[in-house]
Design a protein with these regions (language model features):
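Conserved hydrophobic "DFG−1" position in protein kinase catalytic cores
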Residues: 18-19, 27, 94-95, 112
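Conserved Nudix-box catalytic region and its N-terminal flanking loop in Nudix hydrolases
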Residues: 20, 24-60, 64
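Nudix hydrolase/Nudix homology domain
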Residues: 31-36, 103-138
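Short connector loops at helix/strand junctions that flank enzyme active sites
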Residues: 11, 38, 65-67, 85-90
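Conserved N-terminal beta-strand and adjoining loop/helix that marks the start
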Residues: 2-25, 42
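A short coil-to-beta-strand element that immediately follows conserved catalytic motifs
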Residues: 64-74
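Active-site-adjacent beta-strand/loop module that shapes the phosphate/pyrophosphate-binding cleft
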Residues: 76-102, 115, 134
């Protein structure tokens, strides 16, 4: 992973791939934004990447997964979806099993993606540039 350019800010985040019983991938759109992304967010002081992912998953969509049960998928540098002149350094996990999601107040909308269908054009760069190509190889 190469570092961002000096003219860009860098945000560290954790995110989680969550699937429903039809094999669709959960994406969320946060209030005041226009791109869909994984559930996830920034760490609290002292949190590991997995602890952050677990906490954010519970806060955003009501899914409780023990951090130890999250499986690392990868870490990437990507353009931030909703913040200008900003990159994200994202650690992405996969949650075991299948889930139902219930959006919290900070989530404007959830959408389940059928990975075998044509994908919408309002997805975050982390998804389109890194995660979805990796999932397509599996």
């Amino acid at each position: 992973m190469t570092r961002n350019s000096p003219s860009k800010d860098l945000i560290v985040v954790s995110a989680v791939c969550v699937y429903d019983d039809a094999g669709r991938l959960l994406t969320v759109r946060k209030r005041g934004t226009d791109k869909f992304m994984h559930p996830g967010g920034k760490p609290e002081p002292g949190e590991t990447a997995a602890e952050t992912a677990s906490r954010e998953l519970a806060e955003e969509v009501g899914i409780d997964v023990d951090p130890a049960d999250l499986k690392p998928l990868g870490s990437w540098l990507a353009v931030a979806a909703n913040e200008a002149a900003t990159d994200i350094e994202a650690t992405v996990f996969t949650a075991p099993g299948t889930w139902d999601a219930h959006p919290s107040a900070e989530i404007a909308e959830i959408r389940w993606l059928d990975l075998t269908a044509e994908l919408p054009d309002d997805l975050a760069p982390l998804l389109t540039d890194h995660v979805l190509p990796l999932l397509a190889k599996k």
